[in-house]
A protein has these predicted regions:
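Hydrophobic helical h-region of N-terminal Sec-dependent signal peptides
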Residues: 11-15
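Domain-level marker for long, solvent-exposed, non-transmembrane regions
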Residues: 22-161
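Bacterial N-terminal signal peptides that target proteins for export
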Residues: 1-10
């Protein structure tokens, strides 16, 4: 092999290495969910939240976001965003989600009872954020969780005292 061929081979290899490094990587935004954020509290005790959900399509992602909002209010409390949202969860019993697993499986089923306690009243045009990965999409939406009504329902069903 002569010097010209070696130089051409080296240049082609270098170009291939440099160009492969220019490929944009896959977005990881859809793989991470942002914490549920408090946007405000209404006079009736309901909480306006900014929440993310992930699903196979837009409808699944939005339904999952609603479930995440109710689940956060029930079991974790709202710790991010503006002041005013109740940091204390509705269900304070340790391992209540596991203890009442059958109840909450039915409650959080697709199209389930949880939908009675979530409102899209505070959703504004163009207030949704979208991230997409190869297999799923992630949407961040604004919802209102009817905390007082939710608490009353759990009392009536003897989940909380």
């Amino acid at each position: 092999m002569n010097t010209k061929n070696i130089t051409m081979l080296a240049a082609a290899s270098l170009a291939a290495i440099l160009l492969s490094g220019c490929k944009s990587g896959d977005s990881v935004a859809a793989y991470h969910s942002a914490p549920v954020e408090c946007m405000g509290v209404e006079h009736d005790g309901s909480q306006t939240l900014r929440v993310t959900g992930t699903g196979r399509n837009k409808a699944d992602a939005i339904e999952q976001a609603k479930k995440n909002a109710v689940r956060e209010v029930l079991f974790k409390g709202i710790r991010h965003g503006r002041q005013g949202c109740n940091m204390r969860p509705v269900v304070t019993e340790v391992n209540a989600e596991e203890k009442y697993e059958n109840y909450f499986n039915i409650f959080f089923a697709d199209g389930g009872e949880y939908l009675k306690y979530v409102s899209m009243a505070d959703e504004r045009n163009r207030s949704r954020d979208k991230a997409q990965a190869k297999a799923f999409v992630s949407y961040t939406i604004t919802v209102r969780v009817l905390r007082a009504e939710l608490k009353e329902r759990l009392r009536a069903d003897h989940v909380i005292e």
